[in-house]
């Protein structure tokens, strides 16, 4: 239950919440998972709920916005939307498995994806298995 772990929980319709304002300080925002609909609303400035409003604020304040887009495959419209968001300063980071880490479970895959997203904020997640190079590879 994630709600029990949160310091504050807002309702999606609560567009008057503090995080809907640029004066509310954050390190940025991670949207995980991010649907194509949410991604599209953020890209076009549609702020129909607190999630898209908060993301819009993060972009306008030039803070990191990481969108872990979940749908695949992508069509050209999705790719153009991702390009537009990247040009606005967002980071598109689909939650893809890092097979070099040899995940043994879904939890391992989730931990690796979360860790990679937190890395973008300079935050350490001990569950991340980091690449340490090829063993026995000749030095250049």
What are the language-model segments listed below?
Residues 1-66, 72-140:
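A cross-family phosphate/adenosyl-ligand binding-site feature
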């Amino acid at each position: 239950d994630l709600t029990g772990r949160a310091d504050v929980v807002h309702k999606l319709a609560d567009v008057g919440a503090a995080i809907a304002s640029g004066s509310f300080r954050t390190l940025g925002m991670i949207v995980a998972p991010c649907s194509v609909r949410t991604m599209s609303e953020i890209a076009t400035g549609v702020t129909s709920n607190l999630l898209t409003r908060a993301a819009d604020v993060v972009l306008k304040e030039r803070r990191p916005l990481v969108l872990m887009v979940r749908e695949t495959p992508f069509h050209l419209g999705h790719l153009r939307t991702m390009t537009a968001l990247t040009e606005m300063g967002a980071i598109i980071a689909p939650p893809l498995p890092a097979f070099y880490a040899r995940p043994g479970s879904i939890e391992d895959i989730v931990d690796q994806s979360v860790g990679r997203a937190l890395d973008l904020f300079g935050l350490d997640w001990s569950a991340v298995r980091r690449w340490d190079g090829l063993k026995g590879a000749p030095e250049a």
